[in-house]
Regions:
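Active-site and donor-binding regions of nucleotide-sugar-utilizing enzymes
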Residues: 33-209
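Short internal beta-strands
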Residues: 59-62, 177-179, 282-288, 350-353
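A nucleotide-sugar donor-handling region in carbohydrate enzymes
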Residues: 171-263
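Core catalytic architecture of nucleotide-activated donor-dependent transferases building glycoconjugates
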Residues: 219-248, 254-309, 390-394, 398-415
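Donor nucleotide-activated moiety binding/catalytic core segment of transferases
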Residues: 299-337
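Conserved donor-binding/catalytic loop of nucleotide-activated donor transferases
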Residues: 324-326, 344-348
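C-terminal amphipathic helix plus adjacent low-complexity
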Residues: 357-415
Length: 415
């Protein structure tokens, strides 16, 4: 009698679901983003999540501070202390809404965004772990540090916590820290020279980056080739007919490390008028941080020029279209995010006002100039000249390091 040959049991190559092949609890398929309400910080988190393939599988939470009136003077406090103090002040005086209305302040509606609550996020991570696997937590901004570190402390077996920007606390409170190199400027010889000896022990960071720190050149963001292709298509009708070269001007606002006012506005408008002959079109955008005195000067000097269009701030925001269709960029030196996005396109980027920057901002601009990524805007340029460089690719490189860190833990992201 001939033996009966039974079929071999199925193997992974025969279509076993990936989650079982890798282990039931080792695949990350969702993320939580913890923001602070500032576009520059939240954009970095969403950009990383997008690069990791979880753009459609993340939930945004926010750590919100009271705003308006005396609250603008209390931002140096830890957010929990600030909220308690604001509550006491409101109970004592009871007229905060009337005061805001009298000053013309509009309430900020965040009803569509969840308030970041450590207990809620930890409970969700624990209770859904067996069904949905580990939870990726990505946070950015000073107010998110205590929230993100508490989540890791309370649910370390169920979460992987990434903090973007140096948290100025012990880095072992997070699984991974992604921060620009210029955050370590205080440890450089140039930085040390600018710090009095008695203050050096108090200036953070105090130690060089260790193995779970990812260093970037600039800020993370959502701009990649796919985003640019999509924006080019969406804005084709508006930008394709414009005379070339199209020069996009992005104006930010002064910061603690980059102070300026009407002086920079006058410098910028003078330089733009000088290069106008070599421009086909100029598109100018202001940010929410742009002081009115700056925007007024620019509008007065350039608003009636037929080659110039100034965005009025109404939706839709043309920013993505600008990145896709511009032939060159002029960006104020204060905005690391805007400069990083422009430098991800490989197109000419000119920076105005870098000489007004101090501290770590000088290190950032120096690194870009040394790489040939940016040039100073002097007003003597021929804007039709095209030059290029290897585009900054910080977001993709940071995402790759996240993959590596997860693999060391035996986890991985959904394919």
């Amino acid at each position: 009698m001939r033996p009966i040959r039974l079929p071999e049991p199925p193997t992974q190559t025969m279509g076993v679901p990936e989650i079982f092949a890798a282990g039931a609890y080792s695949v990350i398929r969702r993320a939580v983003v913890i923001g602070n309400g500032y576009p520059g910080s939240e954009n970095q988190c969403v950009g990383l999540v997008r690069a990791l393939g979880l753009s459609d599988k993340h939930v945004l939470y926010r750590v919100t501070r009271p705003r308006g009136g005396i609250n603008e003077w209390l931002h140096w406090l830890p957010v929990s202390v600030h909220k308690k103090l604001e509550y006491v002040i409101r109970q004592i005086f009871g007229y905060s809404r009337l005061l805001s209305a009298a000053r013309g302040e509009k309430p900020v509606c965040l009803s569509s965004v969840l308030e970041a609550d450590v207990r809620q996020i930890v409970t969700m991570a624990r209770e859904t772990y067996e069904k949905d696997g580990p939870l990726l937590v990505v946070a950015s901004g000073r107010d998110t540090i205590s929230i993100a570190s508490s989540i890791k402390r309370l649910a370390s077996d169920n979460v992987f916590v990434v903090q973007i920007q140096h948290p100025r606390v012990h880095l072992n409170r997070f699984d991974l820290v992604i921060t620009p190199r210029h955050d370590y400027y205080p440890l450089t010889p140039e930085g040390q020279e600018k710090i009095p000896q008695f203050l050096r022990r108090w200036i953070t960071p105090c130690e060089p980056p260790d193995g779970h720190v990812v260093l970037t050149t600039g800020a993370l963001h959502q701009i990649d080739s796919a985003a640019l292709r999509s924006a080019a298509s969406a804005w084709h009708e508006e930008f394709a007919p414009l005379p070339k070269p199209l020069v996009v001007v992005n104006v930010g606002g002064p910061t603690g490390c980059c102070r300026y006012g009407s002086d920079l506005a006058k410098q910028l408008t003078a330089h733009l008028l000088n290069v106008l002959v070599s421009c086909g079109s100029i598109r100018i955008s202001f940010s929410m941080r742009t002081p009115e005195k700056v925007s007024k000067i620019i509008i007065k000097e350039l608003g009636n020029n037929p080659k110039v269009h100034i965005w009025d701030g109404e939706e839709p925001n043309p920013h993505l279209g600008h990145l896709a269709w511009a032939d060159a960029f002029v960006v104020t030196a204060d905005s690391i995010s805007l400069i990083s996005e422009a430098c991800s396109t490989g197109k000419p980027v000119y920076v105005v006002g870098a000489e007004r920057c101090t501290w770590k901002f000088t290190d950032f601009h120096k690194s870009l100039r040394e790489r040939g990524v940016v040039r100073p805007f002097t007003g003597s340029e021929d804007m039709s000249d095209s030059w290029s460089y290897p585009p900054l690719n910080d977001t993709a490189e940071a995402a790759s390091r996240v993959h590596e860190a997860l693999a060391e833990r035996g986890w991985k992201l959904r394919p």
